[in-house]
Amino acid sequence: MENFFNNILETGSIIASPSKDPDYNFHWVRDSAIVMKSVITLFEKERKNQKYMKIIENYIKTECEHINFHPAEPKFLLDKTPYLGDWGRPQNDGPALRGIVCLKLLKVYGRKQKDLLKIIFNDLSYTIEQLEEPCFDLWEEEYGYHLYTRMVQYKFLCECLYSDKVQYEDLNERIVNRSRELLGHHFSGDNIYSSYDIHGQILRECDSSVLLGLSHVDYKLDEFDCFSDNIKNYAYKMISVFTDIYPINKKLNIPFLGRYFNDKYFDGNPWIISTIALYQYSFVCPNFYYNKNEFKNFLKFLYDDKKLLLSEQIHRETGEDVSVEKLTWNYSELITLFKFIKNFQIDNLIDLFVTE
């Protein structure tokens, strides 16, 4: 876990990766919230662990500074000022994810309540205001309406409405119900549309952001069924589509997933976070695909690299590392995966990931 904690700086910034080529040495609001979600998982197991407490304190302090800028600013420099270059803005999943994490800290941490509420109210106000507006997706490429963004927004609004610690007069059941209706715009019969543009044109097929979104809301979206047949079928379709285009899948007998079908970034290779999201879903969803041998192959593939550098992508033919290494988001999703595993003989593997 040294690589994971090295990316969480004492200043409170959480870098996406130490890589400078391409340059991921920034604090993304989205990525940092996802990372903090896994830190909270570790903290709940060891509530007296000073390292986890310090990380939490630093994160709260840093986000209190970040909210002085535009709420949907996607990434920050390490001096805690926004990155001002050309980028996909706004990214409305960031405030919702940060709000979800701060709500969780409000429940389990017991300190910095005033600062946490300051962040929550900032993100809640923005989420309500922008609920029906288009934005860029979590892959930072397409402008429109996105299922992932709407899942985390709905989760955030629900949790705020039903929290006895959050009293916000502009939030009511009508807004939460509207948020749920907007989720429904991404489903038509057996079809799931992860993203569509402002003209209603479908932007993506076989998008792993759907599985990541389910994980990031803990598979709990009020009355929304995270384990419906159409979501399971969507996941099965992704396995089939990516196995057809990635030779490495058949070579290693591992169902690697990419970000989405026809991805062009670094030639569209398998992504570690996408594949982990599939296995997370496998462990929590009743009667869904799970192949024990394939899962062991996946763990072996990760552990063959004793330094656990965990690159963002792997080459679709050779399995070699592609793009940045030591992607913080990778380690975070692994911690979440191991949280979901039950009755599986990998205690030694879990210990390796969650201890130094």
Task: Describe the role of every protein-language-model region.
Residues N68-L138:
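Active-site lining segments of carbohydrate-active enzymes
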Residues V29, E65-L84, L147-Y154, V166-I276:
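Extended ligand-binding clefts on enzyme/binding-domain cores
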Residues V29-R89:
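Membrane helical hairpin/interfacial module
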Residues M1-R30, E57-N58, T62-E73:
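Low-complexity, Ser/Thr/Pro/Gly-enriched N-terminal "stalk/linker" regions
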Residues K75, Y83-C102, I202-E223, P270-E356:
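C-terminal capping/lid segments that line or modulate ligand- or cofactor-binding pockets
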